[in-house]
Every structure is written in structure tokens, then in C-alpha cells.
Amino acid sequence: MQRIVNKLLLVAALVAIAPLCNATQLAPCKTAECEAYFDAYTILTKRGHSSAMATLGELYYSGYGTEKDLDKAFKWFRRAAKFGHTTAQYKAGIMYLQTSAYQDIDKGIALLKRSAKATFSPSALALGKIYLQDKLIPRDLAATDRWLTFAYKLNNLEAMKFAKTLRESPDTAKLPLPKLFALVDAEKPVAADSKSSLEEMEIILVEAPDYAAYFDEEIAQLNQSRPDTAKGTGSSIAGRTCSDIWACSSEGDSERIRDLQLSDWGNIALALNVR
């Protein structure tokens, strides 16, 4: 059974990654424009903006405007996470779970729980998979059911797909996941000429983001806002919800499916841990 579950986790992660990597991945970049964005975010972090810290971590992680540096990426994800930045909590948590010099399973799980409790669905999905694996921590199917159900109810596309896979596979259909399977069973079939909610979200997710537009908007807004790290409440930009901003997504708005950067490396990290 364990081998079957591990295989399903790996396949589900890789299938989810496939259509999204090229569309959403922040590619390495050494142009003058990319370096200018990197410099701008470096300045904003010194002023104390947690959103800038999270974005700077992403730039280091991808090698955008600078040399790729996972240690510095981890540093900035952790620093932003300290101030309650949900996306950074997720990313730092995932990096804590990977086999590396800074692996710390307890800290990784704790960060994912903090982020998930703030209704950040990728963290809830990750927790559900981790509790199912019986690898990083002992298997807990009650926790699996709770976290996967939470992610499903937050309209996380990958949680919905994974739940359906678990429900339809003969090897996992009898797992004691009553709340999750009840949600899957309650899904109504759609007309042949209409799109399901999953298909509609897939269309949203595969659209390539305009990173320059995101960066320009966030930099302009942060330059006009007060630093937020003194009170640790995430974005303090007046008149905007945290989830309106690319580097500060908390999934507070139903239309905001998830941070565009989460679909590839986070799932890859989890997939590597179930082999």
C-alpha cells in the first residue's frame, strides 16, 4: 500500500507540474532590466517590506537579475515568513523539508501549518500529502483527511485532482478519508458543452504571467506604503488585499487561485520526498 500511495503522490505532482512549468516559471535572467528589478527589491527589503523580502527570495531562487543562490533565497523566505507572509511561509517550509544542510522537518511542518491556517491552500495540500506519505513524519490519515479537505474547500485545483485520483484508484479508494471522499462524491457532472470549475481554473493557471507588470506595480505600491515588518501583518498597502499582489498572495479572494510561482518547485520537492 505504501508503495502505491507514493507512486500516486509522485504521478500527481508531476502531472500537475507538466502544463505549468513553461507558462509560469520565472526564468533566469541577466538583462539590465532584470538586474534593475533585483536592485529595486533589495532596496525595498532594507526599508522593511515583507512582500519585497518574499519576492527577493524568489529572485535569488530563480537567478533573476542575480546569480542563483538557494541559501540567500532560503534566508529571505524565512525572514518574510517571520513577519507573517503566507507565501514565504510555504516556500521556507518546503525548503526545510528537502534533503539539504538546512533540513528541519519540525520547522517545515510548523511553517506550513501557519500558512495553511491563514487559508493558504498550497500549504494545506502539502500537509495532506505529507501526512499520507509515512516518510517525513508518521502517517496520520485523520490529518490527511483534514488538510486535503481544507485545500479542496479552498478551491485548490491540484487538491481537487489529487482527491479524485485517490477516490478513483482501486488501491486507495478504501482509505479512511470520509470528508475528502464525500466532497468528491458530491461533485455533479457537467453538460458536455460546458466547462467544469477544474477546467476553468486550468485555463487561468496556464496563462503566462507578465512579470514585468507585476514587478512594476508592486514596486510602485511599496514605494508609497509604510514598511510593515514592525507589526508583522503582511502587506500594508492601502486599499488592496494581500492576495491582489503577486508576492503577497494569501488566497483571500476566490478568483485568486494561487501564487503563480508555486506550481512547479514546491510540488517537485514533495515528489522527490516520496520516491
Which residues fall in each region the model found?
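Hydrophobic face of amphipathic alpha-helices that form TPR/SEL1-like repeat modules
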Residues: T55-S62, Q89-Q98, A126-Q133, F162-S169
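Bacterial N-terminal signal peptides
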Residues: L9-P19
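Alpha-helical adaptor scaffolds
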Residues: L26-A27, E58, S62, D71-A118
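TPR/TPR-like (Sel1-like) alpha-helical repeat modules
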Residues: S115, P138-E158, K164-P189
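Structural signature of tandem alpha-helical TPR/SEL1-like repeats
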Residues: K30-F38, E67-W76, A101-L111, P138-W147
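Bacterial N-terminal signal peptides that target proteins for export
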Residues: M1-L9
